[in-house]
C-alpha cells in the first residue's frame, strides 16, 4: 500500500510473463516487467521486448564475494558463504582475503558446515564454492579492492578490521550491493533490510544498479 500497489497477481514462470505482457481477461497488459527468475523467465522477458514491453537487464546466476582480513571470524564467514553458495549449481561464491590462515580456517569450517546441509543444498554449495568460485589470496586490501571492482559482484560483503572499513568501502565502485561487517550477512540483505532482489549479475554492476522504487 505504501508503494501505491493496487493489484497483486499469483502468476509464475514464462506463462506469467506472457500474461502480464499481452494481457488476459483478468490481467491488464503492463508496460514494464522487472524482477529475477529462472533462465526461462529471463528469456521470456527478453522475448516480450519484441512486443513493446520494457524489461530490465538479463539476470544471471547469483554471485557473491567477501573481502576479509585476519580479523574475520571463520565460523561466521563460512556460514555467510554457504548462504549464497546453496542457491544452485550455477551460483558463484568467492572469498577474497589477505590472510592465508583465515582461508585455511574458513575452508575447514566450510567442510564441517557443508556436512550439516541437506544433500541437494550441499551439492549446489560445493559447485558454487568449487568449479564456480573459490578463494583468492591477495597481498593487501588495496589489491582486494582492485579485484573486487574487476569482478563486480552482485553481492559483496566487507569483513575487515574497523579501522580499515572506510578505506575498503570508499574504494569499491562496482557491486550490486555492499554489506559492511559480519553483523550484516547476505541473509539480512536478502530478507530483512530492504535491498532489492533484482541486482546486476555477470559483471553488469560495472554499468548498472539494482531495481528500486521511489
Where are these regions (language model features)?
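Short, solvent-exposed amphipathic alpha-helical segments in soluble enzyme
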Residues: 1-2, 25, 48-51, 80-85, ...
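Conserved NAD(P)+-binding/catalytic subdomain of aldehyde/semialdehyde dehydrogenases
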Residues: 3-92
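C-terminal core of ALDH-fold dehydrogenases
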Residues: 150-214
